[in-house]
Design a protein with these regions (language model features):
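Glycine-rich beta-strand-to-loop/alpha-helix junction loops that act as flexible
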Residues: 38-39, 177-182
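Short pre-catalytic strand/loop immediately N-terminal to key active-site residues, enriched for Gly-Thr
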Residues: 22-35, 174-175, 210
Length: 225
């Protein structure tokens, strides 16, 4: 009952007073506690899918408002486009970013998001960032660092291990932790071919998982919302 998929289905059913139910099968490919928004994207997918299956015809904004009740990241996945997000996830603005390739590493350990935000060492004094300022720079600029990374590294030392491992494989690369961790990522230089990337992934320590992914400007399910 606490799974976001189940909560999303129940929330939509209550909100619309829909009389029937649905059978939902979930196959998770994104590790839990990885900082990749796997649970939030699952919840968004359920809202999108059941909205169509049940012929509810709720608008994107209605679904996003419902999604916010499930978590701050859910509206982003319902928004379906590359976005600059503010507030508690309710203010989103489309931005244009290159569809770069990224190497994402899961260091075999999960981190509970609540542990990060409950940590006494978490600082909340980062200078505000505007959209124009962000777009005028590159995401790898140090001023756009992940404020959760130092805390996550103390809770889960594997985060720093993964960042150090990336530095060994791709020196001078701009690497970061994703979300609240524990995954880390790095933009893959365009000069690297598939064979070279495969060679890097073969060096992963036991228990780690690595994937080559590509940034998207739009969610494949965007037109379903």
């Amino acid at each position: 009952e606490n799974d976001l998929v189940v909560r999303a289905a129940h929330l939509l059913k209550r909100h619309t007073a829909y009389p029937f139910g649905a059978s939902i099968a979930l196959k998770k490919n994104i590790p839990m506690g990885a900082g990749l928004g796997g649970g939030s994207s699952d919840a968004a997918s359920v809202l999108i899918g059941l909205n169509r299956l049940w012929d509810l015809n709720l608008s994107q904004s209605e679904l996003m408002n419902l999604g916010l009740e499930l978590g701050a990241d859910v509206p982003f996945f319902l928004f379906g486009q590359t976005a600059f997000v503010q507030g508690i996830g309710e203010h989103l603005e489309v931005i244009e970013l290159p569809e770069d390739q990224f190497l994402v590493i899961f260091p075999g350990k999960s981190i509970a998001t609540k542990d990060i935000f409950q940590a006494e060492t978490l600082t909340r004094n980062h200078a505000p960032i505007t959209i124009s300022h962000f777009l005028a720079s590159h995401w790898s600029d140090p001023q756009f660092g992940n404020d959760l990374q130092p805390v996550a590294s103390m809770i889960c030392p594997e985060v720093n291990r993964a960042l150090d491992w990336i530095s060994q494989q791709l020196p001078n690369s701009a690497k970061r932790m994703s979300g609240s961790g524990s995954c880390v990522f790095v933009a893959v230089p365009k000069v690297l071919g598939t064979n070279e990337i495969d060679h890097i992934l073969q060096k992963l320590p036991s228990g780690w998982v690595g994937r080559l992914v590509r940034g998207l400007k739009q969610n494949p399910a965007y037109n379903s919302v």
